[in-house]
Amino acid sequence: KATNFTFSKLGLLSNNEIGKFIEKYLGEVQIEDSSIPLAIVAADISTGEKVVFKTGSLATSIMASTCISSVFMPTQVDGRMLVDGAIVENVPIKVLQEMGAKVCVGVDLGSGGYRQPESMVEVLLNAFSIAIDRTIDNQGEKADVIIKPSLAGYSLTDSGNSIKLYAEGYRSGIMALDEIKLLVEKAGPSSLEVLEQKFRSWLDT
């Protein structure tokens, strides 16, 4: 379970459980502790500014980055009300390029279409997804590879299908791996070696 129902005027759901889940299984880790350089994008709902986390609590930054506006309550960070960064930059390729990435891989989570909503929350989620998906084509053009998991029949509230969703994401990633490796190899042999080492390390965790 990743959400709790709430009667807050700022959102229908709380995603505090996401933060608790991360801290339970990863501990109180910081973004800068990641073995792979990491940036997490959120948006300030009061100003419309993009907020990029490169340091600080991993749990807090993910909570902010997953707060779909109107559905989830914004996450308060340093006095700012933060929500899902997709409303300002759905495919944050520019952030990766600024960090020095030579090959950028995007993931399109809207390729499965939309399921008929069965609740007010699902109506809001569909509306959000439809609006955001209209921007992914333009922003996604900047990515070298776009991975498109088959998500037909699922919704953002399908926490009971987590294992199936993980498996589909893994399958889609493996299918794109040869293309990614080729691009990384062109970027430099050392880049390919680093990619393979990081991938093996991830598989062992």
What are the language-model segments listed below?
Residues 1-205:
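Patatin-like phospholipase
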